[in-house]
Amino acid sequence: MKETIAVIILAAGLGKRMRSPKAKVLHEIQGRPMLAYVIDVAVEIAGRSVIVVVGNQAEAVRRAVSGAAVRYVYQDRQLGTGHAVLCALPQLPDDCEQVVVLCGDTPLLTAPTLKSLVQDHLSAGRDATLLAVELEDPQGYGRVLLNDHHQVCGIIEEADASAGQRAIRLINTGIYCVTRQFLSDALPNVTPDNAQGEFYLTDIIRIGYESGRDIGVSYGAALQEILGVNTPEDLARVEALMIGRAAIIS
C-alpha cells in the first residue's frame, strides 16, 4: 500500500470550542499532542507520504511534532475542509494513486481500521469510500444520505440538515479514501453554498454521485476510534479511553 497511497491530515482549524489559546491539535493526551497519534497511524499506512495541513499556530504545530517524517502545507485562510485538501493536492507524491483524508483531532483511530477502509475501497474499485458509523445519538455529526437503493448520494452537515435528515443515524466520520484523480476532478466544483460559507470536503460525495462516479461506504470502525476532540470535556473522555485501551493491551 505504501507505494501508491498518501495521507492528508487536516490540522489547520481554530478549535474555538476548546476555550484555550492553544491550537486544538496541540492539546496533549498522555503527554503527547493529539496530532502525534494521528500522524503515527498515517505513517503506518503511507510511510513518508503524509501531508499535514496547518494554519492556526502553524509553526507551533510543526515544532510540536518536529520529529515526524511528514511534509506540511499551509492553509492561509480558514475556508473549510475542501479548501484545506485543495491546498494539499499539489504536494502529493507523483506516484500517489489513492488518498486517505483524516482529521487531526481523532487520536484514538487505529491503523487496522484505516487498512480495512483502504482494502475495502481498493477491492471494490471505487472512486471514493467514506468511513461511516451508526450512532444512537448522532448529534453533532454530518449525516450520510442514501438513495432509495441504499447507495450513498451525499453528506449533509448538521447545521444544514432538515429535521428529517437530522433523524438519520448513519454519520460521517470525516475519514475518506479516494482516488487522486477523483479528488482532483471534484474539488474544483465544491462551492461555499452552506450555512457556514465554507468549502466542505463532504460535497465531493454528492458531486461524485451526481456525475456517476462509484461512491461507497465502509463500516466496522469502533465507535471510540472516530471520536473527535472539540471541547475540554471531549479531551478528558478521549484520554480516559486511551488509558483504558493501554491497560487492556498491557
Description of each model-found segment:
Residues V7-I9, I51-V52, V100-V101, A128-L131, ...:
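Structural beta-sheet core signal
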Residues R17, P107-L108:
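A short, conserved beta-strand element in the Rossmann-like catalytic core
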Residues M1-S20, V50:
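N-terminal nucleotide-binding beta1-loop-alpha1 segment
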Residues M1-T4, P192-S250:
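Left-handed beta-helix
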Residues E59, A68, L109-A195, T202-I204, ...:
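Conserved core of the sugar-phosphate nucleotidyltransferase
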Residues M1-E3, R32-L102, L108-S123:
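Conserved N-terminal catalytic core of the sugar/cofactor nucleotidyltransferase
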Residues E28, L108, C177, G228-V229:
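Short aromatic/basic micro-patch
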